[in-house]
Amino acid sequence: MDQQRLTHLKQLEAESIHIIREVAAEFDNPVMMYSIGKDSSVMLHLARKAFYPGKIPFPLLHVDTDWKFREMIEFRDRTAEKYGFELLVHKNPEGLAMGCSPFVHGSSKHTDIMKTQGLKQALNKYGFDAAFGGARRDEEKSRAKERVYSFRDKNHTWDPKNQRPELWKTYNGQVNKGESIRVFPLSNWTELDIWQYIYLENIEIVPLYLADKRPVVERDGMLIMVDDDRMKLEPGEVIEEKSVRFRTLGCYPLTGAIESEANTLTGIIEEMLVATSSERQGRAIDHDQSGSMELKKRQGYF
């Protein structure tokens, strides 16, 4: 990587650290969403840098659907223990009681109950007035038009027509009681930036991002990994061992892998240099209907 590229990453790093510090200084009760993925790992690393040698002055929150990959949960708990940050884990109790499952209820309803409603429950429970998220503008078209400080009303809903101008990187965090701001310090990063930064900073990631032989079935054009015995096979489906990795991580029945031999960070970066599709192509929830992500965000999803 040439010096110009390194400078570019340092500029992104400085911008993100500035945003994280601004939120910590401006809001009464911020929280950092921790989804365990690569973007969350970078955001956590930046937060640790922002307040080093002190501890991160706000908790991390994971909204657990009970359907995450087992390796993700193991990584989450190991990371929390290693760095000693406060980790809050919330599961929607109503969703658990009804046995909410992507197999039984479908991707759209499962995501709404276990993710969107679960998130809103947690934000209300703890009274957070700002919540960091790891979304980037290059991921998806609705995220491309979102502000760094994204205003949410008392119902946690997002109205893209009711947002504040952000001139010269000046952010408006004024909110009334019950309102909140979703904050996206990685807004201007690309997927390639994320991987190059992970490589340069030696950031730990969930092993699922690296290619390995894994049991998968092909369903709806996606390779779904069989992560536990809850995976229900449809007629004609056969479990195969393939060398795959994940560009994005979510609930395992709703997350597609890609065939790959990239089992190192440099291998992933080489793949990203020639990639022509978004990582969100591997998320079943983004294909529920046209404009699916924007609809979910309007309802309170990140």
Swiss-Prot record:
Region ranges (Disordered): 280-302
GO BP annotation list: hydrogen sulfide biosynthetic process; sulfate assimilation
CDD domains for the chain: Sulfate_adenylyltransferase_2
The EC number(s) this enzyme carries: 2.7.7.4
Pathway: Sulfur metabolism; hydrogen sulfide biosynthesis; sulfite from sulfate: step 1/3
Cited Pfam families: PAPS_reduct (PF01507)
Catalytic activity: sulfate + ATP + H(+) = adenosine 5'-phosphosulfate + diphosphate
UniProtKB keywords: ATP-binding, Nucleotide-binding, Nucleotidyltransferase, Transferase
Enzyme class: transferase
InterPro entries listed in its UniProt record: PAPS_reduct_dom (IPR002500), Rossmann-like_a/b/a_fold (IPR014729), SO4_adenylTrfase_ssu (IPR011784), Sulfate_adenylyltrnsfr_sub2 (IPR050128)
Gene Ontology molecular function terms on file: ATP binding; sulfate adenylyltransferase (ATP) activity
Recorded family membership: Belongs to the PAPS reductase family. CysD subfamily.
Record-linked PANTHER family: SULFATE ADENYLYLTRANSFERASE SUBUNIT 2 (PTHR43196:SF1)
Purpose of the protein: With CysN forms the ATP sulfurylase (ATPS) that catalyzes the adenylation of sulfate producing adenosine 5'-phosphosulfate (APS) and diphosphate, the first enzymatic step in sulfur assimilation pathway. APS synthesis involves the formation of a high-energy phosphoric-sulfuric acid anhydride bond driven by GTP hydrolysis by CysN coupled to ATP hydrolysis by CysD.
Assembly description: Heterodimer composed of CysD, the smaller subunit, and CysN.
The protein's name: Sulfate adenylyltransferase subunit 2
Native source organism of the sequence: Vibrio campbellii (strain ATCC BAA-1116)
Gene: cysD
